[in-house]
A protein has these predicted regions:
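Histone-fold modules and their flanking histone-like tails across chromatin and transcription assemblies
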Residues: 1-14, 61, 89-94
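Generic structural marker for isolated residues within well-ordered, non-membrane alpha-helices
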Residues: 10, 45, 56, 67, ...
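Residue-level preference for well-ordered alpha-helical positions
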Residues: 11-14, 36, 49, 60, ...
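Short helix-coil-helix linker/hinge
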Residues: 21-23
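Amphipathic alpha-helical segments that form the core helices of the histone-fold
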Residues: 26-36, 51
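Amphipathic alpha-helical interaction segments
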Residues: 27-30, 47, 135, 363
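Helix-rich interaction surfaces within compact, conserved domain-sized segments
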Residues: 44-90
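Pyridoxal 5′-phosphate
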Residues: 88-476
């Protein structure tokens, strides 16, 4: 029911616009108010018609500015129906279930890892200060050493080449700035791409402000960074090349080995953000010409707040955090022992499962695409369908607000990531989607990323409701 404040405001707006309030006006306004109170977003025309009988034409006849007037008269906090997230779909769900299709964003703590975290939390082991000489401290140090060996084994590198950090972002900062600061007097030239993770981009922008020269490479029509593009950008004063292995938004696999060989010949350090590749594809930095490589725990079912940086024996970095000299004097601060232990166990499991999971996820992805083609005509898949990890599908839906679709899917228990905050074509539209030449004013993009617990039943659940959701929210 409308509260007294809202009723007073409605009467004021009616007087200002010289609108005579009828029973139909009140029916529409009361429904819209109740809908917003429940869903925190205004209803669509189809929602209003279904529950009140008022058609789109009726609403534009009854209210001076159509749906916008309905929203403003009852105090829905938007400035315009057109430049914000639009009303979400109203779907009746038969058997509700939760489906998590956002594994590129983060993953849950897998069951096999939980016991190690629980033992640490209870204080059963590993809770001493690893820098101390006590028995508890030595035990914690040994647990870290074991985890370091587990991470190293997953990359076929030496344990002492693994530096633990608080996140993948910190690892990226340490890799990029740690190399660049060695040249703080002469500066130098850095090559990266326009589609890197923000922890890389912001780092090189910062270095640019300090006087370093930075070249940003663009992707080709398939979303790839080519070896030729890197070769053309190399200069005599290039001090670092930083390129991601797998793109977080469209899942494209860059030709890292070829670029690594090129950098090795040019004697230029090669930094790779492998956050989205680690645990999905085989990574062997020493065979790929990679000098530094960042990985993150929460992308492979380990806890959040733990990452690592591989630094080849041939290279050193200037530390960003000074203090007690932990992590071979490269990253000071008492180590997060429990998370490091869990990271090591998750890395071991990922290493064992990498081939079988790749095959299973590929079959699941292909099944998803078949359902997509059959039930959602007019869509596009962003990026090459062949040269990508199967764990990721970035789909463009014509005439759809990606933010509205994301919220509509959330309401039925399906969790995904959108290409922009509220609408395709907004200022926050993805850099890489634009770089591919996609019309972001027309296509709203959604990223579906698959993981360990996803099944065909999850895909079936999504496509049971997706066509109706799209029908309700699409621009006509």
């Amino acid at each position: 029911m409308l509260n007294n404040y809202t009723k007073t405001y409605i009467n004021q707006m009616a007087r200002r616009t010289r609108t005579d309030i009828t029973e139909m006006h009140l029916r529409v306004l009361e429904f819209a108010f109740a809908y917003y109170e429940k869903n925190k977003v205004g209803p669509l025309y189809t929602n209003i018609e279904r529950h009140t009988g008022a058609t789109k034409q009726d609403i534009h006849r009854l209210f001076p500015h159509g749906l916008k007037s309905v929203y403003t008269w009852i105090g829905i906090p938007i400035h315009s129906v057109d430049d914000t997230c639009k009303p979400v779909a109203d779907i009746d769900v038969d058997e509700y279930r939760e489906v998590y299709f956002d594994h590129n964003g983060t993953t849950y703590l897998r069951d096999e890892v939980k016991p190690f975290m629980e033992k640490y939390t209870r204080g059963d082991y590993g809770h001493g200060n690893p820098s101390s000489s006590t028995f508890l401290g030595k035990n914690a140090f040994e647990k870290i050493s074991t985890a370091r060996s587990e991470i190293a084994a997953s990359l076929s590198v030496n344990p002492h080449e693994i530096i633990f950090t608080a996140s993948g972002s910190e690892a990226n900062n340490l890799g990029v700035k740690g190399i660049a600061f060695k040249y703080h007097q002469t500066k130098g030239h850095i090559i990266t791409t326009s589609i890197e993770h923000s922890s890389i981009l912001e780092s090189v922008h910062f270095l640019g402000m300090l006087g370093y020269e930075v070249s940003f490479l663009d992707v080709d029509e398939n979303g790839l960074i080519t070896e030729d593009a890197v070769r053309s950008a190399l200069k005599s004063n290039t001090i670092l090349v930083a390129i991601m292995a797998v793109n977080n938004e469209i899942g494209i696999i860059n030709p890292i080995k070829e670029i690594g060989e090129l950098c090795k010949l040019a004697e230029v350090p090669f930094m790779v953000d492998a956050t989205q590749a680690y645990g999905k594809i085989d990574l062997k930095p020493k065979e790929m010409g990679i000098s530094l490589m960042s990985v993150s725990g929460h992308k492979i079912y380990a806890p959040k707040g733990i990452g690592a940086l591989y630094i080849d024996d041939m290279y050193s970095v200037v530390p960003l955090i000074h203090g007690g000299g932990q992590e071979f004097n490269r990253r000071s601060g008492t180590e997060n022992v429990g998370h490091i232990i869990a990271f090591g166990k998750a890395a071991t499991l990922a290493r064992k499962e990498i081939q079988s999971e790749y095959k299973r996820i590929t079959e699941l992805r292909d099944y998803f695409i078949r359902q997509l083609k059959e039930k959602v005509p007019g869509h596009i898949i962003n990026g090459s369908i062949h040269n990508r990890v199967p764990h990721n599908l970035n789909v463009g839906f014509p005439g759809i607000d990606s933010g509205t679709l994301l919220i509509s899917l959330n309401k039925i228990g399906v969790y995904v990531a959108s290409g922009s905050s509220c609408s395709a074509g907004s200022k926050e539209s993805s850099r890489i989607i634009k770089a591919l030449g996609v019309d972001t004013d027309y296509y709203g993009t959604i990223r579906f990323s698959f993981g360990l617990n996803n099944s065909k039943e999850d895909v079936d659940y999504l496509f049971k409701y997706l066509p109706e959701i799209i029908e309700q929210i699409k621009d006509n």
